[in-house]
Amino acid sequence: MQAQTDTTKRKGLVRLNIDLLSPVYGYFSDAPAKRMGGEAMLEISKNDTLFYVLEAGFHKMEYTRDLFQTTSNGLFLRAGVNRNLMKYYNKKDKDIVYIGARVSASTYQLDYPVFNLDSTYFGKGKSVVVPSANYMAFWVEGVFGTRIEVVKNLFLGADLRGALMVYHTNQSAYKTLFVPGFGNPLNGASLWVNYSVGYKF
C-alpha cells in the first residue's frame, strides 16, 4: 500500500532554540581572536510550512596581537522567515528541512584599550589608549538548515548561513575586526554554521 501525503491540517507551533556553539567557542580555539556569547531563536508557525523567526543575542570578541589588543562587544537582532521543504507522510512527523532569509542589525562597542608602540617618536614600550566608540551594522542573510526531533518536543538543529554586509559605521584609522552576529566585516561577506537545541511548546 503506497504511503499517502498527510493532508490533515497540522497544528501550529512555537519553538525556542538556543545556540550551542557561541557559549563555548572561545574555550576550544587557540587563535588570537577569542569569541564568546549567546543566542536565542524564536520560531512561530501556523501550519509547519512558513515559520516567522526572531533571533537575538550578544557576542564579545577579544583580539590580541603583539602591537595591540582590541575588544568588540555588543548585541544583534535578526528577523525573517523559514520555509519548510518537507512533505509529510505522517502527521506525527515534525522534522523540517528549510530555506530562509533574514534582515539583521547589530549595535556594538569597539575598544582599543592597549596599543603598544616602540618608536623614536612615542618612546620604547609606550602604550597608547584609543577611546572606545559605539557602532552599528546592518546586513542580510540566507539560511539553509534542518531541525530533527530527538525526543518528544525536543529538537537538534543545524543551519548554514551566508551573510552580506549592507552598512556598518567605522573609523578609517581603526578597522572593525568583528561585528556581533556577523563576524569579520572587512570582506563584506561571512559564512558560518549554527548548531542549536530547541523545545516546541
State the predicted function of each range.
Residues 4-13, 49, 87-95, 150-156:
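Short loop/turn motifs that connect adjacent beta-strands in outer-membrane beta-barrel proteins
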Residues 16-22, 55-64, 118-126, 173-178:
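Flexible, solvent-exposed coil segments and beta strand-coil junctions
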Residues 50, 55-122, 197-199:
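Gram-negative (and chloroplast) outer-membrane scaffold detector with strong preference
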Residues 96, 102-201:
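Outer-membrane beta-barrel transmembrane domain signature
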